[in-house]
């Protein structure tokens, strides 16, 4: 009798375990598509967030600069610049040197010489190929930003298209470096007896 009771009890336990297991499997089977769907959605969301982050970084890194955007970024600083200062005169000499434009002996005349930059507007591709050093590129753009030369922004935008790897930070840093070297208070152009270096056109 004891043996039969033991077998009966063992059978009941086994049946209960089997029933519970089947019920659990049924619930799991019922929920698993939803669970898989949620996992898939979460995975998709994570992927999208990751892609947005990557794309956002790429967009910021490779966003095309424009002369208008640079002017907005340097609006206050540009207003404080003195076109006749020693520093800006030296910038003109440097830009003319970079582009192979002959520099006059008297520095104030070099301000007029900068207008010759516009002659290369239709040759922006040649200028872009010639000027490969990022520092030189930044200075050319900086010169076009500082001086209100006719069609300067048109030329600048064309050059920026040709120099997609030139970072905005490089231009801004060059600007601040120029500004820090500027003569304080009332900057004056070079005296008549002070001659800028003569640059022979290449």
Curated annotation (Swiss-Prot):
GO cellular component annotations of the record: extracellular region; host cell cytoplasm; host cell nucleus
Domain of life: Eukaryota
Signal peptide location: 1-23
Extent of motif RxLR-dEER: 49-61
Induction / repression: Expression is up-regulated at later stages of infection.
Keyword tags: Host cytoplasm, Host nucleus, Secreted, Signal, Virulence
Localisation: Secreted; Host cytoplasm; Host nucleus
This protein's domain notes: The RxLR-dEER motif acts to carry the protein into the host cell cytoplasm through binding to cell surface phosphatidylinositol-3-phosphate.
Family: Belongs to the RxLR effector family.
Protein's job: Effector that acts as a broad suppressor of cell death to interrupt plant immunity. Inhibits cell death induced by cell death-inducing proteins, including the PAMP elicitor INF1 from P.infestans.
Record-given protein name: Secreted RxLR effector protein 11
Organism, scientific name: Plasmopara viticola (Downy mildew of grapevine)
